[in-house]
A protein has these predicted regions:
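Short, well-ordered beta-strand segments
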Residues: 1-6, 54, 106, 146, ...
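N-terminal winged-helix
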Residues: 1-26, 31
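Residue-level signal for nonpolar/aromatic packing positions in well-ordered secondary structure
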Residues: 2, 23, 46, 52, ...
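Short beta-strand-centered segments that line the small-molecule binding cleft or hinge
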Residues: 19-22, 40-75
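General small-molecule cofactor/ligand-binding pocket signal
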Residues: 33-37, 163-165
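Short helices/loops that flank or line small-molecule/ion binding pockets
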Residues: 35, 40-51, 132-143
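C-terminal regulatory
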Residues: 67-143, 148-172, 191, 195-207
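Periplasmic-binding protein-like
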Residues: 168-183
Length: 207
């Protein structure tokens, strides 16, 4: 059972499909069960044995889990078409984090890089979502600002439904990790899948 944080399939840096292909070539008789879940659910599921492997954005490390860095993504702050900042000129855009306090913010409702940053810069959270889809829906309402992965928001931007707010200023990078339970040691099939994940995300050799 593999559990993945949502909206990773559209990330060009994520090679989870390639890892699955590698694993199936090595272990064709093993059935895979793929789940999409929030970060806290994945961590808890790996710890209690519901999931053998998880793929999550990095935040607070747990000594009960082992972490293998795989890929990253860039998060930008977006507004919807009906938001006052959507049509604002560059000069009218907020210049720093403090200037965002005047606007309602939609954030993830569990411990994550999203929540940590929002608390650190004291954004005015007035709506809570529990996955990227719900955050996108709240932003599209035009009532809230919120962070989304650039690869997920790209189609909405092309359609003219979302706009990044001061992308050079209001952004952060997020690393994703493969996680397994530290103890007891994972089964051989789990370790084999973890090795396939690492291999699929290894930078190509320059030789």
């Amino acid at each position: 059972h593999l559990a993945v944080f949502d909206k990773t399939a559209s990330n060009p840096q994520a090679h989870i499909g390639e890892a699955i292909a590698l694993f199936q070539a090595q272990a064709p008789d093993v059935s895979l069960h793929l789940h999409v879940a929030p970060l806290n659910v994945i961590e808890r599921g790996v710890l209690d044995g519901q999931f053998q492997v998880g793929i999550v954005p990095g935040h607070r490390a747990s000594s009960a889990l082992t972490y293998d860095e795989l890929f990253s993504e860039t998060m930008y702050l977006y507004c919807g078409q009906a938001h006052p900042l959507f049509g604002a000129s560059a000069a009218q855009q907020p210049a720093d984090w403090a200037a965002l306090h005047a606007y309602a913010f939609a954030g993830l409702g569990y411990h994550s890089p999203n929540m940590e940053l929002a608390q650190q810069v004291q954004l005015t959270r007035q709506a809570t979502g529990y996955d990227q889809e719900s955050i996108a829906t709240l932003i599209l309402s035009g009532r809230y600002l919120g962070f989304l992965p650039d690869h997920y928001a790209e189609s909405f931007v092309r359609q003219g439904r979302l706009r990044a707010v001061q992308a050079p200023v209001f952004s952060y990078r997020c690393s994703f990790f493969g996680i397994v339970r530290a103890s007891p040691q994972a089964a051989r099939v789990t370790l084999a899948f973890q090795a396939c994940l690492s291999a699929a995300h290894r930078p190509p050799s320059s030789v």
